[in-house]
Amino acid sequence: MHRVTVTLDDDLMKKLDAIIEARGYQNRSEAIRDLARIGIQQTSAHASAEHCVGAMVYTYDHSKRDLPRKLTQSFHNHHELSRATMHVHLDHDQCLEVTILDGKANEIQHFADHIFSERGVRYGRLVTIPTSGDGHAHD
């Protein structure tokens, strides 16, 4: 095992300590090891060509110049990944979208990264779940 030193700002340290207490970790090292494993697992899953389903959640400012058009074009360019989208108007300018995706993990991640990087997209989160294959038909 290797010993490393990490510098954290006060706010991040408070949040880490809250996680440690809530989950019952014996010490910070144990918590940081688990969080590192989770991050590595997520990164590996998103980089693979394995089949998965996912939920992409993001908010955006629909009044930003050309943003709705750019988002629509991105969805058309990746139409094979998108299964369904729910659109909610949060206020006069902000919208929330939840999209169910189905395809290779690396392609889904690439699509989500493209959406999240658009100017005017304020928050983005992708959750993926590995599946056993390329989908199936119900008999």
From Swiss-Prot:
Reported cofactor(s): Ni(2+)
Keyword annotations of the record: DNA-binding, Metal-binding, Nickel, Transcription, Transcription regulation
Gene3D superfamilies named in the record: ACT-like. Chain A, domain 2, Met repressor-like
GO molecular function, one term: DNA-binding transcription factor activity
GO biological process, one term: response to nickel cation
SUPFAM superfamilies for the chain: ACT-like, Ribbon-helix-helix
Membrane-spanning ranges: none
Pfam families per record: NikR_C, RHH_1
Cofactor descriptive note: Binds 1 nickel ion per subunit.
Binding site for Ni(2+): 76, 87, 89, 95
Transcription regulation is among the record's keywords: yes
Family affiliation: Belongs to the transcriptional regulatory CopG/NikR family.
Function: Transcriptional regulator.
Protein's name according to its UniProt entry: Putative nickel-responsive regulator
